[in-house]
UniProtKB/Swiss-Prot annotation:
Residues 680-692, 714-737 have a biased composition (Polar residues). This is Cytoplasmic export protein 1. Residues 660-692, 714-761 are annotated as: Disordered. GO terms for biological process: retrograde vesicle-mediated transport, Golgi to endoplasmic reticulum; tRNA export from nucleus. GO terms for molecular function: tRNA binding. It comes from Saccharomyces cerevisiae (strain ATCC 204508 / S288c) (Baker's yeast).
Length: 761
């Protein structure tokens, strides 16, 4: 319904409530709407009158009586608007019509229905000096606390000075408008008879208590007053045995009690709840959520204040009530999880409870935590609950550690990336080596459950899972090993084929040799599943390399590979031809001038060959030709031609700069001057050879087929081998190039690409 046109007709009027468009219920006189007060967002109910000349007196009487009657049990009136005939409103607390459609569910708890009847009797008791006249099924409402309240004061009149004729006339008019039958015209009995009919509507004859039947029949006939009817019911066994009636009276007065009195009331609630939880099921909507739970939360906060700090509190000054904290918290958690309703401040209560050191409190929170995730935001869980929650994994009590472990999956979706992939995994690494078998088993199960949300960066997830499952497969107990195989089975889609081939199969393989036949059987099945995944991937591989040799697709008989003697001879001959060809191409050429005699060649080779080696390679001490000739008497002839060698390029070695280790002499040192010897040594050719400086010989490894060039030629030269050379065609410069430095031999790289597990624990 559009109320804007109505309010615009009122000059300078601002309606202080927001009203919904659709009515929740409607009678012949009223339309009932849910609304909200603009000032503080308080939920309200707005009754809009359907004013007409026929019912105007009835509506105005209802508005007037709503202003002056402030009686418990009537709808609490906040404000009325009756200045305009088109906009007559009665604003009350938030109420809903009695759920007659759900009466069957409410009737399952007879204590709850009896409690509602007692609430109506209490309201009518306050109205003993008034005639209500409208008591019926349509006049019963339920407020936000689940209490039964009455609305509809169209016929309400004071008994003092009331004219029976005038009341009967108004009553007939009212029941004609609503289309119902007038129970009685007598103002003294109309409410009694209306109450009797209402009780019979609430309780079927088969459900009516035996000690109530007579009294209900009497009041239905108007034979007794409401006050007498109430007194008779209070004396029945049904009334006295109803625990909710007495508890409700105490609960209504809780706001005026001191902390000790509140604790007594809640202790009675504890006894009732622990004796029979069914008493608190199927109560009137709102009774548990908005009445019992908020009061329990308030008393728990007082007890928590005493438990957290030693500061004096009103409770603490009188007696120690900390032992009541656990049962009260258990009742609150159980009630909220059943009704799935959470009062204001419930989140703070839960977060503060996690800070308590009491193991029983923490255990309760862990049990109910999966059901409490709804009202808690992700930030509250990650910042206020998780730091205290995770400490349970290091608790000395195994039961608490296990329960904490089981609760992890319900909060992982609310954790930050750092908490999930760093902190949590570190704690799980510790529980995997716990002394308790169940904890070790559950650790693997939890890792399997949260594996899908672990970080996949840098192969982190694959390494973590492989490490965890490998460790559990080595567990001395069978249960953790089976849990590891279960985790591998659930995680098969998380591994790519390369990871399976390189890591996962090696993880499963030890299970094939397990002592337990169950483990061996499951490991075999799992191994085949992973192998099947590899085979499927292998079938999808397409060979598109056009440059591949045809031999790649042929089978090779390695048993007879290279054993054919004829083929081996052909191959050896080919290798020898290649070797000689390389020598021919890389050997230096020498020229012999015609004016050099053969004697001079002998003298040049045998007399001064060693002495003419330069120190360019850093190992041979150089001497001048002139000083060397002083101790030699070469035989020369005019016909001996002089040989000229081809210049040789010497490659610089990596260790040429290491000149201070005593192995290499400086060129400027005194050792460069050859010493004179009185007794020259004789060569094998009977020629005198002057003693040379210290000779250093280097060897360099080369492959047999490597091309030999002058720069990299490697030979081994000694004095005796030099004196035995008889070939006259080899130039002296080639002797100089034959002495090279010794090459380094590369060792095996011990730090190969070993596939290490990235534990990240």
């Amino acid at each position: 319904m559009n109320f804007s046109s109505i309010f615009k007709s009122i000059s300078n009027f601002q309606f202080p409530y927001t009203i919904e468009e659709t009515a929740i219920t409607e009678t012949a006189l009223w339309q009932c709407f849910d609304g909200t007060r603009k000032a503080d967002s308080l939920p309200v109910t707005v009754f809009k009158a359907k004013r007409s000349p026929e019912n105007e007196s009835l509506i105005l009487n209802a508005v007037h009586k709503s202003k002056i009657l402030k009686i418990p049990g009537l709808c609490t009136v906040l404000e009325t608007f009756d200045s305009d005939p088109q906009s007559t409103f009665i604003v009350t607390e938030r109420v809903v019509p009695f759920p007659w459609d759900n009466l069957g569910s409410l009737s399952q708890n007879k204590f709850g229905v009896e409690l509602g009847i007692s609430q109506l009797l209490a309201t009518l008791g306050f109205l003993k000096n008034f005639v209500l006249g409208t008591l019926s099924k349509d006049s019963v409402f339920i407020n936000i606390k689940g209490e039964w309240v009455l609305f509809g004061l169209e016929l309400c009149s004071s008994k003092e000075g009331l004219s029976a004729f005038e009341f009967a006339s108004r009553a007939r008019s009212y029941y004609n408008i609503i289309g119902s039958q007038l129970p009685c015209e007598d103002p003294n009995t109309i409410d009694s008879m209306g109450l009797g009919l209402l009780i019979k509507s609430l309780m079927a004859p088969s459900c009516l208590p035996k000690d109530w039947i007579v009294n209900v029949n009497m009041i239905s006939d108007g034979k007794i007053t409401i006050e007498n009817f109430r007194k008779r019911l209070e004396n029945t066994e049904t009334w006295r045995s109803n625990p909710l009636i007495n508890f409700y009276q105490e609960l209504r007065e809780l706001h005026i009690k001191d902390p000790q009195g509140k604790l007594v009331v809640m202790s009675n609630l504890e006894n009732l709840y622990l004796e029979s939880r069914e008493i608190f099921r199927n109560l009137t909507p709102g009774m548990i959520e908005n009445f019992i739970i908020p009061e329990l939360c308030e008393i728990i906060k007082l007890l928590m204040t005493q438990s957290i700090s030693s500061a004096a509190s009103p409770i603490g000054m009188n007696f120690n009530a900390s032992h009541k904290l656990v049962p009260f918290l258990a009742i609150v958690l159980d009630l909220t999880s059943e009704t799935n309703t959470f009062p204001v401040g419930f989140n703070d209560l839960i977060t503060q409870s996690f800070k308590l050191p009491d193991r029983q409190v923490r255990f309760l929170l862990l049990i109910y935590l999966p059901k409490l995730i709804g009202p808690l935001s992700k930030s509250e869980i990650s910042s206020r609950i998780y730091p205290h929650f995770i400490q349970g994994l290091t608790d000395s009590d195994a039961t608490l550690r296990l329960q904490t472990l089981k609760t992890i999956p319900c909060i992982v979706s609310c954790l930050t990336e750092r908490q999930l992939n760093n902190e949590l995994l570190r704690f799980l690494a510790k529980t995997q080596v716990d002394s308790d078998v169940e904890i070790r088993t559950w650790t693997v199960i939890i890792i399997s459950k949260i594996s899908t949300i672990l970080s996949t960066s840098v192969g982190n997830r694959s390494n973590i899972l492989a490490t965890a499952f490998t460790k559990s497969l080595k567990d001395p107990q069978v249960k953790p090993r089976l849990a590891a195989l279960y985790g591998l089975e659930k995680s098969i889609e998380l591994f790519d084929v390369n990871t399976i081939a390189n890591k996962i199969l090696t993880v499963i393989a030890p299970g094939l040799l397990d002592k337990s036949p169950i483990v061996r059987g499951r490991a075999k099945i799992l191994f085949e599943e992973y192998l099947e995944k590899l085979e499927k991937e292998a079938q999808l591989i397409q060979t598109n390399d056009s440059t591949a040799d045809s031999e790649d697709v042929k089978d090779i008989d390695f048993e007879n590979y290279g054993c054919d003697e004829e083929d081996m001879n052909k191959e050896d001959n080919l290798l020898a031809a290649q070797f000689l060809n390389n020598l021919r191409l890389n050997s230096p050429s020498a020229t012999t001038p015609s004016n050099i005699t053969e004697s001079e060649i002998d003298s040049a080779q045998d007399g001064s060959g060693w002495d003419d080696l330069s120190d360019t390679d850093g190992f041979i001490t150089n001497g001048t030709t002139e000083s060397f000739d002083e101790t030699t008497n070469p035989v020369t002839t005019a016909s001996t031609p002089k040989l000229f060698g081809k210049p040789i390029k010497i490659n610089k070695s990596w260790n040429d700069e290491l000149n201070d280790d005593g192995w290499i002499q400086d060129e400027s040192g005194p050792s460069k001057v050859p010493q004179k010897h009185t007794r020259p040594q004789n060569s094998t050719l009977a020629k005198s050879i002057a003693p040379s400086s210290r000779l250093s010989i280097k060897k360099k490894k080369t492959t047999i087929l490597a091309p030999r060039n002058i720069a990299s030629n490697s030979t081994v030269t000694t004095k005796s081998s030099l004196s035995n050379k008889t070939a006259r065609s080899k130039p002296i410069s080639s002797i100089r190039g034959s002495v090279t430095k010794k090459g380094n031999v590369d060792g095996w790289d011990d730090d190969g690409d070993s596939d290490s597990w990235d534990t990240n624990w």
